[in-house]
Amino acid sequence: MCIRDSRSIGYVFRLKYDYDNKYLAEFTGRYDGSYKFAGNVSGKRWAFFPSASVAWRISKENFMSDLTFLDDMKIRASIGLLGNDDVSPYAFLSTYNLMDGNKNAYQTILNGKVMQALRASVIANTTLTWENTLTYNAGFDFTMWNGLLGMEFDAFYNYTYDILTAMGGDYPPSMGGYYYTYANYNKVDSKGVEITVSHRNKLNLAGKPFSYGASFNLTFARNRYLRYPDSPNTVEWRKRTGRSVDASVVWVAEGLFRSEEEIDNSAWYGTRPNVGDIKYKDLNGDGKIDEDDRTRVGRGNRPELTYGLNLNCAWNGFDLSAQFTGGALFDVSLTGTYYNGYDDNTVWTQAFKEGANSPFCLLYTSPSPRDPKTSR
């Protein structure tokens, strides 16, 4: 059994200001050190992460006193820098491994003995440091009529930079040929809004107080790569920079082949297709469908829109709660479990998947050489 020691140290401070429960401010800071980064060599082990927030409880102002239905209303804003060291330990060090493949081709003689050759698998980068996220947030919240109606609204922007990235490249064969190294390179941003609407109340039920509440929340967020180490020879439509972090790489369907003549005059992938098969777009116009015609399209597999409903009630020592969540505005590649269908109890997505007993509705409406229109 191997025991590995690790160590991290952090210093935290928080300063709060409250004037008449009307003007609020808070300042926090963290000074953190992590063993995962080089210390004595580059001084990248330690980093400072400050944040600040302010709020104005506008409902306390005299000019709001006539609005008796308003329980509380607050306007707020915040900015902060967050650090992340969730990376592999010692990624800043060089690593080596034995050359595999043909042993005779990767052997050398040292002091009269045949030795297996070593090569550098990762080149050291002692400047590796923390991943940083700069967050901006502005919003407001209020409650009315003793809690009968409440609302929270926030708009946010997150800018993440210095993301640890495996960088590829080449160097002279005398050093081993191909290599990769880690660097703080990638940049991603995310922006969106969050809304929560709530209701709570108390009633008298059978001589005992009955309380209940409900809240609905909705979040919309969209991300993209601001910088990604795309290879110089990567075609424009396959680059990650400027696109969603989880965007899929796919061929673009132009419809279905309607006739043998259309197949003869079109580009296609692999073996000759049949009438009724999918027709893909030849993005680079070279007269064939290959990997260079795959492009990054659509959204990622994480919902851009999430929503939820929370319900709760309590009476006479009993309480009950329920939670419902959902997501929308995301894309899923129909492969793996989604392709097989039966792994997750969904309807089959392929009419003739590996001899599966597919639903009649899919068989009846599937394209065929006799009827490529997908409808009979």
Predicted regions and their residues:
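Flexible, surface-exposed loop regions and adjacent strand-edge segments
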Residues: 42-51, 91-99, 168-177, 229-239, ...
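Conserved small-residue
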Residues: 91, 98, 183, 202-301, ...
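Solvent-exposed loop/turn elements at secondary-structure boundaries
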Residues: 4, 65-132, 150-188, 235
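Extracytoplasmic gating/loop element in the C-terminal half of outer-membrane beta-barrel translocons
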Residues: 34, 271-277, 327-366, 370, ...
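Transmembrane beta-strands of outer-membrane beta-barrel pores
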Residues: 29-35, 58-60, 79-83, 155-161, ...
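Short loop/turn motifs that connect adjacent beta-strands in outer-membrane beta-barrel proteins
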Residues: 22, 59-73, 145-148, 202-212, ...
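Hydrophobic, lipid-facing positions within transmembrane beta-strands of outer-membrane proteins
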Residues: 9-15, 31, 48-56, 73-75, ...
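Outer-membrane beta-barrel transmembrane domain signature of Gram-negative proteins
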Residues: 4-26, 38, 111-112, 123
